[in-house]
């Protein structure tokens, strides 16, 4: 058995091996003859959490901790809880010999921890562990070459990633491993000029052995191109990295979705509720149980009545606070529990219910065989009878709605058809909106020899008394625009409000064009029915009525006098912005920052309402948001039927628009449309708002856009946008749909920003010089008709303000 002196010698040897630069701490000289000594080695990096724990026995009377022979005391970083010591944010001074002495009747047992804290340099890119070794091998290879060699890149595969986007306060490391004979020199340039340590706060470190530069705690002023210049007498080579520093945006605590989760357990069980909290500022976490007093769950102040079950103490870690332990639960414990987390920015909370049931019997009563067999027979018989009834009902329904056969010539319409219209709703909808409804009754034959629906009036629609409006009280006016299958004209409706029968209301009337097809009629009816089911909201275009009897179908909707949001913003650009505009039509309206945030807030409210009705828009953009006379934002075209399964998104169509630059990657590549894909489009719409109607991804061809999106690139921050709003855009553009915010969260955040924004905050709308720099030749005419515009359209938009087709210095994009 090893003696005490042998153990001391072994501990000193371990410490000398771990830290050659530090004097090896020695063990205490005086130890009880009965003492048992153990030594454990422990290595950690700078900034890590040190955790040292003693092994305890049942008969331990007391525990003492020492470091390098001195009693260990608690500090703001050091916490001692009996048999455990925790040191937060470890530094090199925390290295040493820690001793845990447990006193027992049989003697003292001492455990030594030889701790070594070493420095660690994080890097933007993952360097191989053998950087030092490879550098040595390169130099040996260079020196062994008899002939001179010009500089060359030793590991070009490690230099492929040129754009680096990192959060502020991170450490950045760029490497340019090179070789040559004689050994070349290394210099670093920033923005094409020599980069010296005094050019940035905190300087930088150059490690010539690994051909690298290291910058600690980067700040936004560190953005820019960094060039490594490698040269010797026989040549020179260089490589440029682009650094982008993203500022952190403070936010209230974020709680992981689905936690804590509802639980159902037998009485007497143990329950753990888990709550994952993410927060930059230090969060304060509490666990609450909702209670009732005199049958009420709320106090006189209207706030819920709660009992604090767990709160953070002086020595409690966040990890401990994220779990609530309930032991041996009873029926009285069955109630609602809440995890409440707050920081200096705000408060977040998630709740879960605990259900306690009777304990499951260990010996359940087993059915006798005859009874069990009888139940199976009855259930099987009932199932077969139900299947037969369902089959008969479906067969009769098909016969009732069956279309009459056409002749071989499709140009002759035999009869008016019943259109089974399928609603556009999200996949999780369980409402009746997902069912097919027959909206058109058969009528007499049409004598038309045209494949177009010239006899529109011969299609009889069932009258809906809630929405039917008399034709003789509707006056049609000038055209407002044309769509794929119909047109919109201005109109005046007399007595639209039944309480004011003589009042004239300006409206917009949707109708079919003269060359409309049967599918066009089906689409218009589908849009009308969708608007009926969705209902009314201030921030969507609402259905006001319809003329379905004794004539062509007219769908009456709200009129927005100021046009779509894209043109509304462009018309309010000041003359100083670089785009072709007509000075005669420049509006005198001044837009404040609060006006732009209000636009975004109203659109978010409209989309929140549509999402609550299980409606997926699929084409949210500034061109599909209309503006009323009172500058109220109203979302349009949410009821359109869009065929998303037969569109080639990589090609232009003759009359169709492909909104690829607004589409989420999962919609673009996999054709998966959800509320979260609408959130991506909302992020692009935010970018449109704060560029006053700019075209997304300016100057980027669509084929290149597909590649950039897959690589994680995103658009730059607009010049007049705050960091908080830009971070909101970036959240909307998260590659993982489930990580994007919901419209409810967007409404809450924008509501807060609107409330905190002053009305007098007018924008400095002069575009910065470096916001767009020439990247593609400018071949504009007086009107925009680019095939590379943000929406693919065969026909140009007349009199449309044009933005220069410029590209940012790095492609106008950032990588997430």
From Swiss-Prot:
Compositional bias of kind Polar residues: 779-788
Cellular component annotations (GO), alphabetically ordered: cytoplasmic vesicle; cytosol; nucleus; plasma membrane; receptor complex
Protein kinase domain residues: 474-763
Annotated Ig-like C2-type domain residues: 25-118, 156-244, 253-355
Alphabetical list of PROSITE patterns matching this protein: IG_LIKE (PS50835), PROTEIN_KINASE_ATP (PS00107), PROTEIN_KINASE_DOM (PS50011), PROTEIN_KINASE_TYR (PS00109)
Topology with respect to the bilayer: Single-pass type I membrane protein
Gene3D superfamilies reported for this sequence: Immunoglobulins, Phosphorylase Kinase, domain 1, Transferase(Phosphotransferase) domain 1
A GO biological process held by the record: animal organ development
Family, similarity comment: Belongs to the protein kinase superfamily. Tyr protein kinase family. Fibroblast growth factor receptor subfamily.
Function description: Tyrosine-protein kinase that acts as a cell-surface receptor for fibroblast growth factors and plays an essential role in the regulation of embryonic development, cell proliferation, differentiation and migration. Required for normal mesoderm patterning and normal skeletogenesis. Phosphorylates PLCG1, FRS2, GAB1 and SHB. Ligand binding leads to the activation of several signaling cascades. Activation of PLCG1 leads to the production of the cellular signaling molecules diacylglycerol and inositol-1,4,5-trisphosphate.
Domain characteristics, as noted in the entry: The second and third Ig-like domains directly interact with fibroblast growth factors (FGF) and heparan sulfate proteoglycans. Isoforms lacking the first Ig-like domain have higher affinity for fibroblast growth factors (FGF) and heparan sulfate proteoglycans than isoforms with all three Ig-like domains.
Protein name from the UniProt record: Fibroblast growth factor receptor 1
Organism name: Pleurodeles waltl
């Amino acid at each position: 058995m090893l003696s005490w002196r042998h153990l001391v010698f072994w501990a000193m040897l371990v410490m000398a091996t771990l830290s050659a630069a530090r004097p090896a701490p020695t063990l205490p000289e005086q130890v009880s003859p009965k003492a048992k000594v153990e030594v454990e080695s422990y290595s950690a990096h700078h900034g890590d959490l040190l955790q040292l724990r003693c092994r305890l026995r049942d008969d331990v009377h007391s525990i003492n901790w020492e470091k390098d022979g001195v009693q260990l005391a608690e500090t703001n970083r050091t916490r001692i809880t009996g048999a455990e010591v925790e040191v937060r944010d470890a530094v090199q001074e925390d290295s040493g010999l820690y001793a845990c002495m447990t006193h027992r009747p049989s003697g003292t047992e001492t455990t030594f921890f030889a701790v070594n804290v070493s420095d660690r340099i994080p890097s933007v890119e993952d360097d191989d562990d053998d950087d030092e070794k490879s550098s040595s091998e390169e130099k040996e290879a260079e020196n062994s070459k008899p002939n001179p060699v010009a500089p060359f890149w030793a590991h070009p595969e490690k230099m492929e990633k040129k754009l680096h986007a990192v959060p502020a306060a991170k450490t950045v490391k760029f490497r340019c491993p090179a070789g040559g004979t004689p050994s070349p020199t290394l210099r670093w340039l920033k923005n094409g000029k020599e980069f010296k340590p005094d050019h940035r706060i905190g300087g930088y470190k150059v490690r010539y052995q690994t051909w690298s530069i290291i910058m600690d705690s980067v700040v936004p002023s560190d953005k820019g191109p960094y060039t490594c210049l490698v040269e010797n007498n026989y040549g020179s080579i260089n490589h440029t990295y682009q650094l982008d520093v993203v500022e952190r945006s403070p936010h209230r605590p974020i709680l992981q979705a689905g936690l804590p989760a509802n639980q159902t357990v037998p009485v007497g069980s143990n329950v753990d509720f888990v709550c994952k909290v993410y927060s930059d500022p230090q969060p304060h976490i509490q666990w609450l149980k909702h209670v009732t007093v005199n049958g009420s769950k709320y106090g006189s102040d209207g706030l819920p009545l709660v009992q604090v079950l767990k709160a953070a103490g002086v020595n409690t870690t966040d990890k401990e606070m994220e779990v609530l332990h309930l032991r041996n639960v009873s029926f009285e414990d069955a109630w609602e529990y809440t995890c409440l987390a707050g920081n200096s920015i705000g408060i977040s909370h998630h709740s879960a219910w605990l259900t306690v049931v009777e304990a499951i019997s260990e010996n359940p009563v087993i059915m006798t065989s005859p009874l069990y067999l009888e139940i199976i027979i009855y259930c099987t018989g009932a199932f077969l009878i139900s299947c037969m009834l369902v089959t008969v009902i479906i067969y009769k329904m098909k016969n009732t709605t069956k279309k009459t056969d056409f002749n071989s010539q499709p140009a002759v319409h035999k009869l008016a058809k019943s259109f089974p219209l399928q609603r556009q709703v999200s996949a999780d909808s369980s409402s009746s909106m997902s069912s097919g409804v027959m909206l058109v009754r058969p009528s007499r034959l049409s004598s038309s020899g045209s494949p177009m629906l010239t006899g529109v009036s011969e299609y009889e629609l069932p009258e809906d008394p809630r929405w039917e409006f008399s034709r003789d009280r509707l006056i049609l006016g000038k055209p407002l625009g044309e769509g794929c299958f119909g047109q919109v004209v201005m109109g005046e409706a007399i007595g639209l409000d039944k309480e004011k029968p003589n009042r004239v209301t300006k409206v917009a009337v949707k109708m079919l064009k003269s060359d409309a097809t049967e599918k066009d009629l089906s689409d218009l009816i589908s849009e009308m029915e969708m608007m009926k089911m969705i209902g009314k909201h201030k921030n969507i275009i609402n259905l006001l009525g319809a003329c379905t009897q004794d004539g062509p179908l007219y769908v009456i909707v709200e009129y927005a006098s100021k046009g779509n949001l894209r043109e509304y913003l462009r018309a309010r650009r000041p003359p100083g912005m670089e785009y072709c505009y007509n000075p005669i039509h420049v509006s005198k309206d001044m837009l404040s920052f609060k006006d732009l945030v209000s636009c975004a807030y109203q659109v978010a409210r409209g989309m929140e309402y549509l999402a609550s009705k299980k409606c997926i828009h699929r084409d949210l953009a500034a061109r599909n948001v209309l503006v009323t006379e009172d500058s109220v934002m109203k979302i349009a075209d949410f009821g359109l039927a869009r065929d998303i399964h037969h569109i080639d998104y990589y090609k232009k169509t003759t009359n169709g628009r492909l909104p690829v630059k607004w589409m989420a990657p999962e919609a673009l590549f996999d054709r998966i449309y959800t509320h979260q894909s609408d959130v991506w489009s909302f992020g692009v719409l935010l970018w449109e708002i704060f560029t006053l109607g700019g075209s997304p991804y300016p100057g980027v061809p669509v084929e290149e856009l597909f590649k950039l999106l897959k690589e994680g690139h995103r658009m730059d921050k607009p010049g007049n946008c705050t960091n908080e709003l830009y971070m909101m855009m970036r959240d909307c553009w998260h590659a993982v749909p489930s990580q994007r915010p919901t419209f409810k969260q967007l409404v809450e955040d924008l509501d807060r920003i609107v409330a905190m924004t002053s009305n007098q905050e007018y924008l400095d709308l002069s575009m910065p010089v470096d916001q767009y720099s020439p990247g593609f030749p400018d071949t504009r005419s007086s009107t925009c008709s680019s095939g590379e515009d943000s929406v693919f359209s065969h026909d140009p938009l007349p009199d449309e303000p044009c933005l220069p087709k410029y590209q940012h210095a790095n492609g106008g994009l950032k990588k997430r």
